[in-house]
Amino acid sequence: MKNPLHYQLSEYDCGPTSMMNALAYLFEREEIPPEAVRNTMLYCLDCHSKEGIPGKRGTSRAAMMFLSNWLNEYGDLGIMSVSSEYLSGRSVYIDGESRINHALNHGGVAVVRLYLEEEHYVLMTGIQNENILLFDPYYWDKPYEQKDILMDDKHPKEYNRIVPFQYFNQENKEIIYALGPVEEREAVLIFNEKTKTVPEEVIEYFI
């Protein structure tokens, strides 16, 4: 059985929440070892505030890269059928040819750093026409000013937002869900190797 995706508990834990949501989306509850949950929380929330308070600046890029590499090694050991790839800079964009779109079209997900007033992590789970299906872990129950960004509460195990492509590739940090300056971008692609599809399988499916 798969669990519903969940929301962050504080103002700071969007990173580990999105990483654990990635596992919850890709795997049955019985397939997720407790070690994966423990290490996700252990490696994240590593940034200190200006006052020196741990965790109050969220999760660093270094921590996400480390966690991505750890998941890969965990998969290589055969403990869990997981694989991961860390992307940064020019590799992080939304387009028909992008690595993120390719992952979403082939059974994978992407945990992406973007902007929601401040730097923020969300989980991308799919594509619908020219929109990204994503789960934003920051609970919000008011409609957006942007009428083309849709809220969805009917797919709790998959997504809660439908966001047009056009928002993501913006470098302006003031734009909601913008990926921001190219040199600062990052994403973590994650797959369940048992459910990952290859291009040939997708083509045959649509035929």
Question: Language-model segments: which ranges?
Answer:
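Cysteine-nucleophile protease catalytic domains, especially the papain-like/related folds used
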Residues: 1-88, 203
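Short, flexible/disordered intra-domain loops and linkers
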Residues: 50-55, 89-91, 144-152
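Intrinsically disordered, low-complexity boundary segments flanking structured domains
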Residues: 65-70, 96-101, 164, 174-177
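Hydrophobic transmembrane alpha-helix bundles
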Residues: 66-82, 112-127, 149-160
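Active-site-adjacent substructure of cysteine-protease-like catalytic cores
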Residues: 85-144
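Noncatalytic regulatory segments and standalone regulatory/sensor domains
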Residues: 104-105, 127-207
